[in-house]
């Protein structure tokens, strides 16, 4: 079988489980053959050998079981860069790029800015921020040692030196350190949310946060005052139906200038507020 026929066959198979079957099929073939996408188009008639076909069949089997492409290939693009991922980390999503966009609007690239990320996972957010803000000092926390190993691997890949990765249950290991900005894409899915059925390959602890999905966010907002400088800003990603609850939690904890930002689909996705004594 040549590459062109393989793409067509896989596209038809994957159509049953994916809304982007052509893209998925190309990525799997690129992975099995260890080639670029341009190679697929310039070598359509190139035959796939037996060893490559066996690997491709194995990859296809995983995709047909609804395993995300990112876990199959072990990598995912975020903020125009490639990051390693594993089943110990969440897959970075485009919505989370809002955190970077809004943070960059609030910072001065020439100043030394201290930034804290809570729940860094594969490190995509902190590393992307560190690359954009060369003078920043970023601290990235996660409770998962396995996730931090992936984050450190990504830091090495992108030659990052201004991110400090720390194993910590939220703020626990920070002592009295304070930051100009705190940001997080925390767990915010409800315990029995039906959407979890489609996320069964991803780490549950990084997704679910209590019956209403707000346990982690409550903790983050209530305790941020001990680790943020006066006038500092806290930015939190959340579910599209959680805006009112997030505003209530911020107000209960006396935060100022509470603002919600919508994602590209027009859903409330990020809320930020300023701490002022």
Language model: regions and residue ranges:
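Conserved hydrophobic residues forming the short capping helix/wall of the S-adenosyl-L-methionine
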Residues: 14, 107, 155, 224, ...
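Conserved SAM-binding loop
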Residues: 140, 209, 235
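Conserved AdoMet
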Residues: 31-105
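Non-catalytic accessory regions of SAM-dependent methyltransferases
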Residues: 1-33, 39-41
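Conserved Class I SAM-dependent methyltransferase catalytic core
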Residues: 212-274
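Mobile active-site "lid"/loop adjacent to the S-adenosyl-L-methionine
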Residues: 186-216
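Residue-level signal for inorganic ion chemistry
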Residues: 28, 66, 96, 125, ...
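Conserved SAM/SAH cofactor-binding pocket of Class I
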Residues: 95-195
